[in-house]
Amino acid sequence: MSRPKNQNYKGHGLQKGKEREQRASIRFKTTLMNTLMDVLRHRPGWVEVKDEGEWDFYWCDVSWLRENFDHTYMGEHVRISHFRNHYELTRKNYMVKNLKRFRKQLEREAGKLEAAKCDFFPKTFEMPCEYHLFVEEFRKNPGITWIMKPVARSQGKGIFLFRRLKDIMDWKKGTAGKKLTSLEAQPARNTVNPSGSHDTRSSDDQKDEIPVENYVAQRYIENPYLIGGRKFDLRVYVLVMSYIPLRAWLYRDGFARFSNTRFTLNSIDDQYVHLTNVAVQKTSPDYHPKKGCKWMLQRFRQYLASKHGPEAVETLFSDMDNIFIRSLQSVQKVIISDKHCFELYGYDILIDQDLKPWLLEVNASPSLTASSQEDYELKTCLLEDTLHIVDMEARLTGREKRVGGFDLMWNDGPVSREEGGPDLSGMGNFVTNTHLGCVNDRKEQLRQLFRSLQGQKKTPN
């Protein structure tokens, strides 16, 4: 159980074994009234706890975590949906700092070739503290396009593109050091799921609120891969159960998010051309939710294979695997790896014309609000499989390489796709145990998995 530390603590969460066995239900709590609530309420043996009731499982928002984590006692069995300092990866400026540091570390320890595997994020400067470094870089490469992003906002708010130094000078005079209002830092409210429930918090990815607004200035990818003349990015889901040792799962499904307007560099002020966020696109005058602003990753992978062949697609998706692992390794030593914590990250990836993937950002609270029935089904399955891996029911053995739509890609080292394969990625025909954009026969896999686990329980050792 969990309980605030400042209350009269009498061993909550450390009940005797017999008492624990008698309590069959798992008490959950969440502040998110979206697809997640639907999944939690329909999970057998799980009961909702409201207000200050004691809980075993809490899918919280990042604001609750910041205000309460350090003051809450959690028993051995309790699980919570964020790592304490998740922002080391999910704040844009911290993510870049950690990746730059990790790249330098790799260059010292393993050489430039290994360090080059971290070259998957555009040249970036934190503003205003690296303003003079940015100006120096800007003058070396005049005429290119840059994109300015606030480090702690979501839904495309505060983002703008520029090519003139005057634009950034005006920004520095008028915006640097501006304090965020609570309204600016929080997502929109009162959206509705296909299930009919209202989402009061996460209509899009939640971000940390910070007292002073910082930005990152990032070199804009001017040659994005286009489909039908439109720009898109990919949303991919990675589940981390532990940082020490690093244990990470990759979900097979995800989606491509398209802009509503054909791409051009002639109108850098048009957000409908350059920003693919659903929150931005749905404000477009000609937006229609059924027009095709999202593709499932399986469709996207098939499209690329038909255009470029399966070998090129395998290389692209292998490069994305590298992004997931290297980014997690970059924060492995700074994230507080509390055994009570897990995290479902939403990775945003951009593909350029050379089929090179670029990491745009990592979201600590990827939107769980559905924009269509297909989106609702994806997120429902994603959350169900996340709960299977968190395993509050203690059904798994810990040796599983696949659970539903999740594949174990890293377990204190790379995981081989084939049984009996080598343990080191530099050996032989090693193929990482990932299947992003492949067939997701999760229902059949779960049926076989739990039947096998049930059989193991019945068989005496």
Curated annotation (Swiss-Prot):
Gln-155 is the main determinant for regioselectivity, which segregates between initiases and elongases in all tubulin--tyrosine ligase family. A glutamine residue at this position is found in elongases TTLL6, TTLL9, TTLL11, TTLL13, TTLL10 and favors glutamate-chain elongation, whereas an arginine residue is found in initiases TTLL2, TTLL4, TTLL5, TTLL3, TTLL8 and favors initiation. Its main location: cytoplasm. Mg(2+) 2 binds at E361, N363. One of its GO terms (cellular component) is microtubule. It catalyses: (L-glutamyl)(n)-gamma-L-glutamyl-L-glutamyl-[protein] + L-glutamate + ATP = (L-glutamyl)(n+1)-gamma-L-glutamyl-L-glutamyl-[protein] + ADP + phosphate + H(+). Mg(2+) 1 binds at D348, E361. This is Probable tubulin polyglutamylase TTLL9. It is an enzyme of class 6 (ligase). PROSITE patterns: TTL. ATP binds at K149, Q155, G156, Q218, R219, Y220, I221, K231, F232, D233, T276, N277. One of its GO terms (biological process) is protein modification process. Residues 22-402 form the TTL domain. The record marks Q155 as: Essential for specifying alpha-elongation versus initiation step of the polyglutamylase activity. The lineage of its organism: Eukaryota, Metazoa, Chordata, Craniata, Vertebrata. Its cofactor is Mg(2+). Belongs to the tubulin--tyrosine ligase family. A protein binds at Q155. The gene is TTLL9. Keywords: ATP-binding, Cell projection, Cilium, Cytoplasm, Cytoskeleton, Flagellum, Ligase, Magnesium, Metal-binding, Microtubule, Nucleotide-binding. It comes from Bos taurus (Bovine). Probable tubulin polyglutamylase that generates side chains of glutamate on the gamma-carboxyl group of specific glutamate residues within the C-terminal tail of target proteins. Similar to TTLL1, may acquire enzymatic activity only in complex with other proteins as it is most likely lacking domains important for autonomous activity. Mediates tubulin polyglutamylation which induces establishment of microtubule heterogeneity in sperm flagella, thereby playing a role in normal motile flagella axoneme structure and sperm flagella beating pattern. InterPro entries: ATP_grasp_subdomain_1 (IPR013815), TTL/TTLL_fam (IPR004344). One of its GO terms (molecular function) is protein-glutamic acid ligase activity, elongating. Pfam families: TTL (PF03133). Residues 1-21, 182-208 are annotated as: Disordered. It is found in: Cytoplasm, Cytoskeleton, Cilium basal body; Cytoplasm, Cytoskeleton; Cytoplasm, Cytoskeleton, Flagellum axoneme. It comes from the Eukaryota. Residues 198-208 have a biased composition (Basic and acidic residues). Its EC number is 6.3.2.-.
